[in-house]
């Protein structure tokens, strides 16, 4: 299992949006420049974040993007699903029913689920629950507590200086 680079772009971009003053938006160009990434790909990432209700686009001359929810209400899982979609990592094709040693494929019913499927789905659910338990707010607070004061001041100044 591997997430696309879009997930990383989303996390790093949203991280800095936490510091934006209220009613302040930020454009794709500024976010791309901040993170040293391509505007075109980041635009696609933000389109997905908007469709998921994580960010909101504000039209007009002073338009751009802003967070659409409180940072406590944006989980890691929300961000991943917005970018990657809600698919499961493992899809059981029930090949055990085709095994040459199986006399009757009908013995494999819901009473006898594939143990491989059960174990992997349990692991997936544990991972999803772990990702649901961490929010954008948690990420921001955890990372920023170790930032030196001059770095925090630089981020705040950058946030205030964004032209919208």
Locate each region found by the language model.
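Key DNA-contact positions within bacterial/archaeal DNA-binding proteins
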Residues: 40
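Non-DNA-binding regulatory cores of transcription-related proteins
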Residues: 70-164
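Alpha-helical residues within the helix-turn-helix
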Residues: 33, 50-51
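Beta-hairpin "wing" of winged helix-turn-helix
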Residues: 54-62, 66-68
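Short alpha-helical segments that sit at the start of domains
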Residues: 1-14
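A short alpha-helical element within helix-turn-helix/winged-helix DNA-binding domains
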Residues: 28-36
């Amino acid at each position: 299992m591997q997430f696309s680079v879009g997930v990383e772009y989303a996390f790093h971009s949203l991280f800095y949006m936490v510091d934006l003053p209220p009613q302040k938006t930020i454009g794709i160009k500024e976010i791309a420049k901040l993170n040293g990434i391509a505007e075109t790909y980041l635009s696609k990432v933000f389109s997905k974040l908007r469709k998921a209700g994580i960010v909101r686009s504000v039209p007009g001359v002073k338009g751009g993007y802003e967070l659409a929810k409180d940072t406590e209400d944006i989980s890691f899982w929300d961000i991943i699903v917005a970018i990657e979609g809600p698919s499961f990592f493992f899809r059981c094709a029930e090949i055990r029913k085709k095994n040459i040693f199986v006399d009757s494929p009908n013995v494999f019913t819901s009473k006898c689920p594939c143990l491989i499927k059960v174990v992997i789905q349990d692991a997936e659910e544990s991972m999803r629950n772990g990702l649901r338990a961490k929010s954008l707010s948690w990420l921001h607070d955890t990372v920023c507590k170790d930032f030196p004061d001059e770095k925090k001041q630089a981020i705040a100044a950058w946030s205030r200086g964004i032209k919208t």
